[in-house]
Amino acid sequence: MIRITVPATSANLGIGYDTLGMAVSLYSHFTFDRAETLTITGCPEQFQNEDNLVYESFVNALAEWGEKTFPVSIDISTEVPVARGLGSSSTCVVAGIMGAAALTGHTVTREELVAIATAVEGHPDNVAPAILGAAVCSFTPEGELPRCLRYEVSKRLRFITIIPPYEVHTSDARKVVPQEVPLSTAVWQMGRIAGLTRG
């Protein structure tokens, strides 16, 4: 049996829209084991099948490495609320890939893990800090693998999580993001982003 723990993340920090995220101290815990049939527990029944994001990521990783898919049991226990802006999907993606590596004995580098997770998730801003920890500025040059710059977060800072009593999916949240911001707002944000590392 393999146990994997992945931290929640908060992304789109300040001026770092779609690029800057950080790991936070809420966690999702996953166990993986080979099985006779696919079994998924610890999540709503509608996700206890092949459409489960953990399993989809597991299968994608196997395909990336030229491995055949095999039945697996997956148990999920999470502190990370779904669709509340804390990277719940990223925890699933990262765990699925790591579970595939562990059960097949495949050695995966952090760079490879970020690249596969980004391909599944669509962008690296949540998966990169979930893998690397701390704060990460990440971007993907056209036709290239994701690049990540990791920064330690000041220990002087304390974070508060405010979780709304309703779900907000990323696709819906993006619809209300303004396409332009005033220069003064951008300057204000840039001037304060260093506080993340310096406190």
Set out the residue ranges of the language-model regions.
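N-proximal short alpha-helices
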Residues: 3, 86, 101, 146, ...
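Short amphipathic alpha-helical segments, especially helix-boundary/capping motifs
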Residues: 3-6, 32-37, 72-76, 91, ...
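Generic, ordered loop/turn and secondary-structure boundary motif
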Residues: 18-25, 48, 81-83, 87, ...
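Glycine/small-residue-rich loop that forms an oxyanion/phosphate-binding "nest" at active or ligand-binding sites
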Residues: 78-129
